[in-house]
Design a protein with these regions (language model features):
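Short helix/loop capping segments that flank catalytic or ligand/cofactor-binding pockets
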Residues: 4-5, 13-15, 115
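Hydrophobic, lipid-facing positions within transmembrane beta-strands of outer-membrane proteins
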Residues: 1, 82-87, 144-148
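C-terminal beta-signal and terminal closure region of outer-membrane beta-barrel proteins
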Residues: 31, 38-50, 65-67, 114-154
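Repeated loop/turn-to-beta-strand initiation elements of outer-membrane beta-barrel proteins
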Residues: 1-5, 95
Length: 154
């Protein structure tokens, strides 16, 4: 049996989570639901609705974009990823009649990500941004892929 794994980490990077910024303004970002309900009630005249909403939630979840704080949405893009893992097993000859050798293999890519980044993936970058700045704006993370193979020699 053989096992091969490739991991990768990044530390010290930052990324603008424009998805969170945009979705908060649209009212479809779940962590803002409670704060936005209170902000809407206050705008309709119920000032007591703001009792449980702190200043951070007001800046992060404001419905009007000009009132939202962009700096809240710049997040650490530190991560550890298991880029690939492959496992191969040489099947004993007693199980493979007529074959000289048989190897069964499994491989996977992008199997695991450990990050505190709240967006889809800490490595995504909008194609419209330069190489000097990055933002996550409705991009797809890398696909998780799997491979299974059987190799037989006669």
């Amino acid at each position: 049996m053989s096992i091969e794994a490739i991991g990768e980490f990044q530390r010290g990077g930052h990324l603008l989570n424009a998805n969170g910024f945009q979705n908060a303004g649209l009212g479809i970002w779940q962590p803002c639901f409670t704060a936005q309900r209170a902000l809407r009630a206050a705008a309709a005249g119920d000032a007591s609705a703001l009792a449980g909403v702190n200043a951070g939630d007001r800046a992060r979840c404001a419905i009007v974009a000009a009132q939202r704080d962009y700096s809240y949405w710049v997040e650490s893009s530190d991560f550890f990823k298991l880029r690939s893992l492959s496992v191969s097993y040489d099947v004993p000859k007693r199980f493979t009649r007529g074959a000289r050798n048989t190897t069964v293999s499994f491989a996977g890519r992008n199997l695991f990500v450990n990050t505190k980044y709240s967006g889809s993936d800490p490595e995504v970058a909008d194609q419209r941004t330069s190489t000097f700045s990055r933002r996550d704006y409705y991009n797809f993370p890398p696909y998780r892929t799997f491979l299974f193979s059987v190799r037989t020699g006669f």
